[in-house]
């Protein structure tokens, strides 16, 4: 069985490979602008900005684009004033959905989201309706083929402060408290591991979906991810691996 994390990884790979690459840049630029505005333009003293810049570099964003986004955030260059807004709701099948948006027009974003929820048979809910279902955690991912000694990896991660290690699937996931993410990531990199790290929201419980509900959920999540204002989408669905791959193949086709 797989859930939101597998869908997110597949979606990211497809966006990186096709014309939607520009959408990744759009979202990352907004993230950098807001991070620089709230915590300053120095990546050494602003962890959120450092994380956003690292993600941008991983996506091969040109250096000048990154620097320009930082200057927009600090006010050195004129830029749009984005606000961070959280939206919550339910997708088909009772799946909880937690959305983080960066927008310059909250009314427009709320209207567009309400339209999508209604279109796919879900419902936009009040603040706090589903946030209790999710826990904020740091997640470090390492491709299985990059790990020669799993026991060594586990020991380094645990000694650095990791809470849990999930090695049943690829990539291997190391779970940390958000405040320990940077330390665990640094220790792994010092040991020679290539890692990807992010702060995310992990569901405490999941909802299994199949058939039409499964198709509607994936179609709905794809539509949410395609919105420029939406930075991150989290959900608590669970479905059969093969069914997910078949549905995504049809949707992408």
UniProtKB/Swiss-Prot annotation:
<dbReference type="GO" id="GO:0003677">
    <property type="term" value="F:DNA binding"/>
</dbReference>
<keyword id="KW-0963">Cytoplasm</keyword>
<dbReference type="InterPro" id="IPR029072">
    <property type="entry name" value="YebC-like"/>
</dbReference>
<dbReference type="InterPro" id="IPR017856">
    <property type="entry name" value="Integrase-like_N"/>
</dbReference>
<dbReference type="GO" id="GO:0005829">
    <property type="term" value="C:cytosol"/>
</dbReference>
<dbReference type="Pfam" id="PF20772">
    <property type="entry name" value="TACO1_YebC_N"/>
</dbReference>
<dbReference type="InterPro" id="IPR026564">
    <property type="entry name" value="Transcrip_reg_TACO1-like_dom3"/>
</dbReference>
<keyword id="KW-0805">Transcription regulation</keyword>
<dbReference type="InterPro" id="IPR049083">
    <property type="entry name" value="TACO1_YebC_N"/>
</dbReference>
<dbReference type="InterPro" id="IPR002876">
    <property type="entry name" value="Transcrip_reg_TACO1-like"/>
</dbReference>
<keyword id="KW-0238">DNA-binding</keyword>
<keyword id="KW-0804">Transcription</keyword>
<dbReference type="InterPro" id="IPR048300">
    <property type="entry name" value="TACO1_YebC-like_2nd/3rd_dom"/>
</dbReference>
<dbReference type="GO" id="GO:0006355">
    <property type="term" value="P:regulation of DNA-templated transcription"/>
</dbReference>
<comment type="similarity">
    <text>Belongs to the TACO1 family.</text>
</comment>
<dbReference type="Pfam" id="PF01709">
    <property type="entry name" value="Transcrip_reg"/>
</dbReference>
<protein>
    <recommendedName>
        <fullName>Probable transcriptional regulatory protein TM_0466</fullName>
    </recommendedName>
</protein>
């Amino acid at each position: 069985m797989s859930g939101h994390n597998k869908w997110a990884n597949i979606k990211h790979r497809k966006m990186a490979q096709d014309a939607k690459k520009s959408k990744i840049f759009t979202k990352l630029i907004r993230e950098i602008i807001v991070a620089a505005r709230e915590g300053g333009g120095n990546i050494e003293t602003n962890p959120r900005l450092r994380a956003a810049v690292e993600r941008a570099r991983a996506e091969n964003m040109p250096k000048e684009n990154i620097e320009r986004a930082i200057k927009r955030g600090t006010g050195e260059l004129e830029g749009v004033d984005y606000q961070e807004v959280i939206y919550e709701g339910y997708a088909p099948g009772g799946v909880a959905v937690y959305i983080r948006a960066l927008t310059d027009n909250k009314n427009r974003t709320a209207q567009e989201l309400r339209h999508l929820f209604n279109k796919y048979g879900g419902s936009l809910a009040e603040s706090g309706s589903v946030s209790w279902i999710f826990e904020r955690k740091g997640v470090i991912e390492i491709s299985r083929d990059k790990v020669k000694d799993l026991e060594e990896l586990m020991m380094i991660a645990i000694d650095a402060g990791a809470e849990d290690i999930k090695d049943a699937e690829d990539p291997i996931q190391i779970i940390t408290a958000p405040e320990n993410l940077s330390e665990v990531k640094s220790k792994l990199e010092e040991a020679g591991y290539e890692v990807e790290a992010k702060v995310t929201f992990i569901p405490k419980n999941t909802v299994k979906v199949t058939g039409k509900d499964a198709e509607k959920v994936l179609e709905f999540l794809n539509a949410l991810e395609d919105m420029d204002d939406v930075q991150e989408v989290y959900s608590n669905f669970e479905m059969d691996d093969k069914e997910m791959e078949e549905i995504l193949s049809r949707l992408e086709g």
